[in-house]
């Protein structure tokens, strides 16, 4: 969330940033609303001050036996007490209206983010590896999985409807191996602390990371009022909600392997076959909490950690710098890792790593204090996938497919597969 004081002082900067995102200018409406709110706040404070002063004057008048003045002052106090609740309610309404408006404004892109309308304006940062060269015709993951006999969309549909998958036997183990491999890599080599956190959260947590109020339709809400997490970013980032951290202890780096739940409300007709776009999927999430000076460098580090997963698995990928029109609501800059899928003959996103500055921290009221500082500053937050497990499984199936229809297990996963080196058709 942006600071209204900053908006008052940087109205043109805000409108220019919104224009880069393809949004209409908002600064003047926000400033007008804030001026109205500040005016009523001043009125409330003036009434409260006059009420308190008049109350003291009543005592002085009574001491001087000036009954006429005392009665006049009592009438003034009574009038203030009558008017004050309405003014306080107006202040509350205007404050809520302003906060709601501020909560719906996207973050300000960094200056080096490419300006564009959508994904077609994203820029290739670099790539790694090469596309596999085969004699056989590539297949899509759902063809491979069904032919192996371990991927069942029909049974999943009977259980839960569309956009779900049942994996069994060797593919279920491969999915588990991928998640465990990612978690071990990030905790053992990359310095992240593993966290086991709830899969259901309150409104406040979803607001803190920016899912609410603007993107409520993208998530699932229980009848009890909890939300199923669309990503572990929600829980990991909110671990510091309301805290004042010691700068010396930053950065904090958290990781979690969890299911994620998404309604895919805006994805009708897209990726309807297979596992690419599911209502439920596993993901290894990375979150960093830094001071203001370190967040840009941490963004590069986090992205490199996610890249290492794909390098260890021998998967060709490219890193894209997202344009302003394709970047997420809370991000100041985002790198997408796109893995090569031979079956689709294209690159698909497998990880998204974003630096959010203090945007989420303001919503969560998460701060830090330097060793010699009296005041506090908002922390900076970063999040990324390290990586999406289901999409990584898709990439392994399509890139490690053999001529006979079997799939070779990548070397990095062998310690997790109980000696299984090749996934073959079910007997």
Swiss-Prot record:
Pathway in which the depicted protein is active: Aminoacyl-tRNA biosynthesis; selenocysteinyl-tRNA(Sec) biosynthesis; L-seryl-tRNA(Sec) from L-serine and tRNA(Sec): step 1/1
InterPro entries associated with the record: aa-tRNA-synt_IIb (IPR002314), aa-tRNA-synth_II (IPR006195), aa-tRNA-synth_II/BPL/LPL (IPR045864), Ser-tRNA-ligase_type_1 (IPR002317), Ser-tRNA-synth_1_N (IPR015866), SerRS_1_N_sf (IPR042103), SerRS_core (IPR033729), tRNA-bd_arm (IPR010978)
Any Pfam family: tRNA-synt_2b
Location relative to the cell: Cytoplasm
GO MF entries: ATP binding; serine-tRNA ligase activity
EC number: 6.1.1.11
Reactions that this protein is recorded to catalyse: tRNA(Ser) + L-serine + ATP = L-seryl-tRNA(Ser) + AMP + diphosphate + H(+); tRNA(Sec) + L-serine + ATP = L-seryl-tRNA(Sec) + AMP + diphosphate + H(+)
UniProt entry tagged with the keyword Cell membrane: no
NCBIfam families for this protein: serS
Job of this protein: Catalyzes the attachment of serine to tRNA(Ser). Is also able to aminoacylate tRNA(Sec) with serine, to form the misacylated tRNA L-seryl-tRNA(Sec), which will be further converted into selenocysteinyl-tRNA(Sec).
Quaternary structure note: Homodimer. The tRNA molecule binds across the dimer.
Domain notes: Consists of two distinct domains, a catalytic core and a N-terminal extension that is involved in tRNA binding.
Name this protein carries in UniProt: Serine--tRNA ligase
Species: Rhizobium rhizogenes (strain K84 / ATCC BAA-868)
